Every structure is written in structure tokens, then in C-alpha cells.
């Protein structure tokens, strides 16, 4: 299983220029059929999808032209614990992200009188989850989320023009520091 959510907002000239929210999820199945490993995947989660997955595994195994055998990984006895910084992506509102994006753009414009344009100010967030299970008892799950911000600016000083930007990829919303 894999699933995730994403959010993206961009500002230009004090207004929202782009706004996207998306969710996706899917499940993949691998299995042996006729001595060969087949695989199939779907983004549907209904009774018909189960039948289509099974039929897809059979069909893909039948179409294989190699005699090489894939192996279903039985897993390890132990896995290391990965320390992750706690994220507040799930509890941060769209309104707060929009406000932060507009603020990033406004502060970039106001930072120096030589700044003539802020062509990009963006705030995004993403979260994802992956679950791996198999017939040997493997049952692993991982999830994560983060924010992303980007601001670019154009400055002029006489005949000289400079372009610069700032990127942040924090786990917590307050890590996006204008």
C-alpha cells in the first residue's frame, strides 16, 4: 500500500497564482503463478479491484519471457528504528499555508529597495505512507511528512542584476522562516 497527500500554493504580485491539493493511494500485489512472479497494481479500493489485481498477477506472470526467478523477501529478524522529527503537516490549515506564502512574498519584496521582482513564492506540504506485507509475515510500515518553501527574487543595482532564492524543507510549519 502507498498513499499520500500534497498541498501547493504559490503567490505572485500579492495574489495567489497557483493552488493545488491532491491525494493518491494504491496497492500493488506480487505473486507466483505457473512458476513465475507476476505483479499488478491499482488505485481502486473495491471488490472488483481485488479480482483485477489477482487477474493482473496471473496475466503478467504468463507474459514473462525470462526464466529468472524473483524471490519474495522473507524479511529480517530486526530492523533499526529511525528517529524522525515530529511533523505538524496534518494539523496545519490551508489558510495558514496561504497566509505564510503571501507573507514570504511580501517580506522578500520589502527586504531591500533594490529588489524589483519576486517571481516565485511557494509553500507546499507532503505526507506519505507505505506498508509492505507478504505471506512470510513481513509487515512493515513507514510514514513521513514535510513542508517545502521556496522564494526567489530579482534585484537590480544600477546596471547589475542578481537573482537569488531561499529554500526550506522543515518538518514543522514554524521552520518556514520568512
Give the predicted meaning of each segment:
Residues 1-178:
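Active-site bordering "gate/hinge" segments
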